């Protein structure tokens, strides 16, 4: 990826996260701890922006001279219409999670898939050659699936309740010329069961299992998965979802959503400051913030 240093100037630099709601976001604690550790004169806040106010909020980035922002649910797709430019990867994903203000020109990027791959690399998990299954077809699934396809998985299956959305995603991956052709399966179908039985990596990109509905799961029978399978959940509240708990009880390697949160945040620094954020500091701060929430 091309790394560009922001040209923003001033006595202090203001950044933040746009979403609705964002009160429980761990991003402010994570980034502010990193700024302190690096001796940087910067601050990161949480901006609760209802969808009806999104265009005004984006204009406010220019007017107030913010260095940049992260973008989260429900704005990742809609925000693209209000930016001056969108990086090719973000356009392929169809979502933006990082915005940089370059002298009043707002450019959108997506670091979700990049952070996802780095979090697996950190755990020593090699993606290339694995059979991968992505559960879901929303914004997170799009970023994950694109990067899995580019990283050389042997097989990629998308399982989603809306088959049409899964097929749209598969078609977008084909247009992006990923080396592997994505397959689509309905939950509970024979095709889905066969893909899961041969999976080397399963990634939950749905909100199933997220607080407060912690007993929901995108996969009722973890016993279908082979012993070498890695189970990844992009949900990070709770840190161990029902899916991860059951996978761990079956002896499988598990990775929670905190890893992706931290790494996508550290990758955003590449665009804001021209260097990667301090992962260990960010992880410690994010974990403390999440554990301190009711």
From Swiss-Prot:
Enzyme class: oxidoreductase
Pathway note: Metabolic intermediate biosynthesis; chorismate biosynthesis; chorismate from D-erythrose 4-phosphate and phosphoenolpyruvate: step 4/7
SUPFAM superfamilies: Aminoacid dehydrogenase-like, N-terminal domain, NAD(P)-binding Rossmann-fold domains
GO BP terms in the entry: amino acid biosynthetic process; aromatic amino acid family biosynthetic process; chorismate biosynthetic process; shikimate metabolic process
GO molecular function, one term: shikimate 3-dehydrogenase (NADP+) activity
Residues the record marks as active site: 76 (proton acceptor)
Binding sites annotated in the UniProt record for shikimate: 25-27, 72, 97, 112, 236
Gene3D superfamilies: Leucine Dehydrogenase, chain A, domain 1, NAD(P)-binding Rossmann-like Domain
InterPro entries the UniProt entry points to: Aminoacid_DH-like_N_sf, NAD(P)-bd_dom_sf, SDH_C, Shikimate_DH, Shikimate_DH-bd_N, Shikimate_DH_fam, Shikm_DH/Glu-tRNA_Rdtase
Binding-site positions, NADP(+): 136-140, 234, 257
Highest taxon, organism lineage: Bacteria
Keywords: Amino-acid biosynthesis, Aromatic amino acid biosynthesis, NADP, Oxidoreductase
SS bond list: none
Function: Involved in the biosynthesis of the chorismate, which leads to the biosynthesis of aromatic amino acids. Catalyzes the reversible NADPH linked reduction of 3-dehydroshikimate (DHSA) to yield shikimate (SA).
PANTHER family for this protein: BIFUNCTIONAL 3-DEHYDROQUINATE DEHYDRATASE_SHIKIMATE DEHYDROGENASE, CHLOROPLASTIC, SHIKIMATE DEHYDROGENASE
Protein name as it appears in the record: Shikimate dehydrogenase (NADP(+))
Source species: Symbiobacterium thermophilum (strain DSM 24528 / JCM 14929 / IAM 14863 / T)
Gene of this entry: aroE
């Amino acid at each position: 990826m091309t790394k560009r240093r922001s040209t923003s100037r001033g006595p202090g630099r203001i950044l933040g996260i746009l979403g609705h709601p964002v009160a429980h976001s761990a991003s402010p604690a994570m980034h502010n701890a990193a700024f302190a550790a690096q001796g940087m004169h910067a601050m990161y806040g949480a901006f609760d922006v209802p969808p009806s106010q999104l265009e005004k909020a984006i204009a406010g980035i220019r007017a107030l001279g913010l260095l940049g922002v992260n973008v989260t649910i429900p704005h990742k797709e809609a925000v693209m219409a209000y930016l001056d430019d969108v990086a090719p990867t973000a356009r392929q994903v169809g979502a933006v999670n990082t915005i940089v203000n370059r002298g009043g020109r707002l450019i959108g990027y997506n670091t979700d898939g990049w952070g996802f791959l780095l979090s697996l690399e950190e755990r020593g998990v090699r993606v290339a050659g694995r059979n991968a299954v992505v559960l879901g077809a929303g914004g997170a699934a799009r970023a994950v699936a694109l990067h899995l396809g580019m990283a050389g998985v042997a097989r990629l299956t998308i399982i989603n309740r809306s088959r049409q959305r899964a097929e749209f995603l598969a078609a977008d991956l084909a247009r992006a010329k990923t080396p592997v052709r994505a397959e689509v399966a309905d939950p509970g179908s024979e095709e889905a069961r066969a893909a899961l039985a041969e999976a080397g990596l399963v990634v939950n990109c749905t909100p199933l299992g997220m607080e407060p509905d912690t007993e929901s799961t995108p996969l009722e029978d973890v016993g279908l998965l082979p012993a070498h399978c890695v189970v990844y959940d992009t949900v990070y509240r709770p840190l161990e979802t029902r899916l991860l708990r059951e996978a761990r009880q079956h002896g499988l390697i598990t990775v929670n959503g905190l890893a992706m949160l931290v790494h996508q945040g550290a990758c955003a620094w590449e665009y804001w400051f021209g260097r990667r954020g301090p992962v260990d500091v960010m992880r410690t701060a994010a974990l403390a913030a999440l554990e301190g929430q009711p």
